[in-house]
């Protein structure tokens, strides 16, 4: 059985993520989606909790017709030491043979650890990016909804994600500066 790892922050998940996951599942039997920066939330760069992101991913993949029995989603907190982070990923995830990533630094870490690393499939990256979704949300621009699956938009609305992001971006959500 071939199992792959697909790490990302997914702040929030968008159609590009769904496309990439569907493409990777054409090449492997199972996929471990690692939701990184799991301890961060309620800040401008990371407004959603790990649980909310896992929920959004699950609903987005269900909406896209992905067989969820082939996907395992896990939270991965960051640590300051990158080799410790790599060990944590290996500890939290079921065994995997290949890593799909678009991040050159993540690719370097896994390659040096002996893993096969492949470029994650990209889908209109200039259009579909979590950064863009967050920027549109902060501005109150309804175009953000076109970039995410309907289920993700519904969750963001249900949890007050746009307001949370606007407040966080105003600088009130920086406990390390209090």
From Swiss-Prot:
Presence of keyword Calcium: no
Keyword Metal-binding: no
BP-aspect Gene Ontology terms: NAD biosynthetic process
InterPro entries on file: Cyt_trans-like, NMN_Atrans_arc, Rossmann-like_a/b/a_fold
Entry keywords, A to Z: ATP-binding, Cytoplasm, NAD, Nucleotide-binding, Nucleotidyltransferase, Pyridine nucleotide biosynthesis, Transferase
Pfam family, one: CTP_transf_like
Major subcellular site: cytoplasm
Listed pathway(s): Cofactor biosynthesis; NAD(+) biosynthesis; NAD(+) from nicotinamide D-ribonucleotide: step 1/1
Catalytic activity: beta-nicotinamide D-ribonucleotide + ATP + H(+) = diphosphate + NAD(+)
MF terms (GO), sorted A to Z: ATP binding; nicotinamide-nucleotide adenylyltransferase activity
Enzyme's top EC category: transferase
EC numbers for this chain: 2.7.7.1
Compartment(s): Cytoplasm
Superkingdom, taxonomy of origin: Archaea
UniProt-listed SUPFAM superfamilies: Nucleotidylyl transferase (SSF52374)
Cellular-component GO terms for this entry: cytoplasm
Annotated family: Belongs to the archaeal NMN adenylyltransferase family.
Official protein name in the record: Nicotinamide-nucleotide adenylyltransferase
